[in-house]
Amino acid sequence: MTNVAIIQFPGSNTERETFMACHRVGLNPVEFLWNHPVDKLSDFDGYIIVGGFSYEDRSRAGVIAALDPILDQIKIESELGKPVLGICNGAQILVESGLVPGLNKYKIGLALTDNKRIREGQVVGVGYYNTWANLQMTAEPNSCAFTRHIKKGASFNIPLAHGEGRFVAPELLLEEIIANEQTIFRYCNDDGLIIDEFPTNPNGSIFNLAAVCNTSGNVMAMMPHPERSKNGDLIFSSMLEFIELGNPINNNSLNFDTPLIDIDNYNKNDNVEWIVEMIINDNEAVSVQNALIQKGHDVIISRHTHWEIDIDQKKSVTLSKIDKSGELYNSNKEFISKVKVARNTASYLVRQHDDIFGRAKLESLKDKFEIKEISNIKHGVIWNITVNSGNFDSTLNTILDTNILFNPLSYECYRIR
């Protein structure tokens, strides 16, 4: 019997469909929760990390789960050649953990960030999106554990449902993973044509990427949901064959060298700055704090929402209109505050490169609320780290190396103090 661990975190929600898909092809799925003893993972022949919203996508999708001790053991098992499939949120976890694409020492090489639906050069939609998507197999069948029963060039139609499914990759790394045939599935239209715009590309992924595997071919991060349709069964039957053949991995490698994280000091300009603090408990900050404590850091984490507002004229009147709109903060549970100076505390401003959320708020304020005096809005998050014990600077550097606060491929970061 081929036993596959179905790995679930708090917030996972597609385990039933995954169990059904495994049963259809002869795999024996076994529930494995995040709080089970990690050493028991070695008893399994393969692993599937299911979709959903692990830890409510706090900080960003997949990153809290990626720091869980389970992933350390999954890395060990994957190095033995065992297959690991991450679906949707599972794909985000594999990317945030560095298991995909497989850089040296599990360095982060990819990002899965907010959807951006583009047609004729214009952004026509952002955020969560669900549909049925066409996927084309663009690698040789034996290049990946999950494609052995699929012909190169074949396409199939399966469901897709996510808010952060847009693959981002450095150009040089993308060239390498293409050459290695790690770009397993790409979005195509009904005729099998790969067109880099919506609706063929449903989320703006670079190179129309829907799934990417690691260098050995035994770990795959896939955003659409093959478990939700029989159309995806060949992925699971391929996994079974791969295990039965003794895990025949590939010997590819990646030479891409991840650049060092460059964090500049934040220089405040003349624009209006709103720093929003929560009245109630900030569960997102608590989750990040707990994850760091689990990693051995004696820290306190707090968080503020940061808005930078560029106003053309009538500044005080315009700010009053923005305030009354309720678009930038909810006065029932938030208030405008400031970054507090505290001992052994560092603050970092994190922003998405594309700042999709800031642009959406700008459009809403101008179009819905007819506040035309705003020329630009930038959205960010301020993370405050208080180090209770240990060396202050080395603790900060170690925390930044976890990427828990931001993925450097899709975010920019500034040191406030």
Regions found by a protein language model. Give the residues of each.
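Amide-donor transfer/coupling interface in amidating biosynthetic enzymes
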Residues: 76, 111-268
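N-terminal beta1-alpha1 cap of cysteine-dependent amidohydrolase-like domains
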Residues: 1-101, 120-125, 129, 200, ...
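A short alpha->loop->secondary-structure connector
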Residues: 101-112
